[in-house]
Amino acid sequence: MLMATNSMEISINASAEDVWAILADFPAIAMWVPMIQHSCSITQATSGVGATRRVQIAQQTLVETVTVWEPQQRLAYTIEGMPPIVGIATTTWTLQPSPKGTRVTISTEIPSSRNPAKRFAATKALERMSLAARFMTTGLRQEAATRGREVTQ
């Protein structure tokens, strides 16, 4: 299957443990991503593989289910609720310790095909997901800085 992919990388002045603590609070993404109006767990499990959250962004409701849970290293989840022609996307966060904190990579994959309509839809969806990734990485960096100040005070 062809996949449309996008990734971005940022550095955060916080340990992988501290960054993971933010990502691992899976249902609470609305607390640090301003474009998300609401998020909540829709499974009993709020962490680990299988944990599922509902995310409300404007008029769109997404359901995100954890598929990879490697503490302080990698978190991946599927995203359902986009237009049917787009299908199910996958977002992966990767954390790598660095001399100045943590290097964070967020990548998104969306199914594509040789069909021009599906390829166009995947490209447009990936553009929106790229914008969302910028909001999420900015929010993650700000949340890590806020929590770091709380710890040092």
Question: Which residues are covered by each model-predicted region?
Answer:
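A conserved amphipathic terminal alpha-helix motif
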Residues: 109-153
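Short Pro/Gly-enriched beta-strand edge/turn motifs at strand-loop
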Residues: 35-36, 45-49, 73-79
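Hydrophobic-ligand binding "helix-grip"
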Residues: 56-105, 109-112
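Short aromatic-glycine motifs in intrinsically disordered, low-complexity regions
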Residues: 51-55
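A structural signal for well-ordered alpha-helical scaffolds and beta->alpha junctions
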Residues: 16, 59, 88, 126-129, ...
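Alpha-helix N-cap/helix-start motif
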Residues: 32, 86-88, 115-118
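Hydrophobic ligand-binding cavity/cleft-lining segments
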Residues: 1-43, 153
